[in-house]
């Protein structure tokens, strides 16, 4: 598609799902889990860790490729990722979903995790894709926190966008993370979401206590709770 011909349309919610919380919860429950079969590839990172890439089906031998980035505590197995990979395939695009460190179902080797400002892993994968497929169009698509990571990468001076990427899309990005965190604390539904993420993150810290103990006190992190409302 010619980028100049793209015309965004305003979002109109269904009458029976006007509220943002309703849309969030119903999408979690009702969204189809159908997606393309994945072929997992494990790539070694320059710092001695690994990343798991899940490749969808290849529509043709010259298909464009799109790297898909999930949101906070997501993975390639989440329904929204499987759905977008399915749609990309239908459009003749070869999807590859990057699982951030610790999100592929297996703890990574190093103490480090992923976060909204960490761009070295998607940068590494995009450079790898460009080396392997120099003649194919390559794009990137990020959801939520994955969108944050993608946009930050695009704005980094050392990242040559024109050489690495032909297109990029960021969806539902929390641009102001501090404001978003404060907003979550102002309602019981927001605190429900925050508790959901915190539970998952604390579990990952518990899995890596031995690795983290020389750097921080992992026990203190596993006892973190949400701040009480003033």
Give each language-model segment a name:
Residues 82, 96-116, 149, 182:
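Serine-hydrolase catalytic machinery in alpha/beta-hydrolase-like enzymes
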Residues 222-228:
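Conserved small/polar residues in nucleotide/adenosyl-binding loops
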Residues 103-139:
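Catalytic nucleophile-loop/oxyanion-hole region of alpha/beta-hydrolase
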Residues 26-57:
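N-terminal cap/lid segment of alpha/beta-hydrolase-fold proteins
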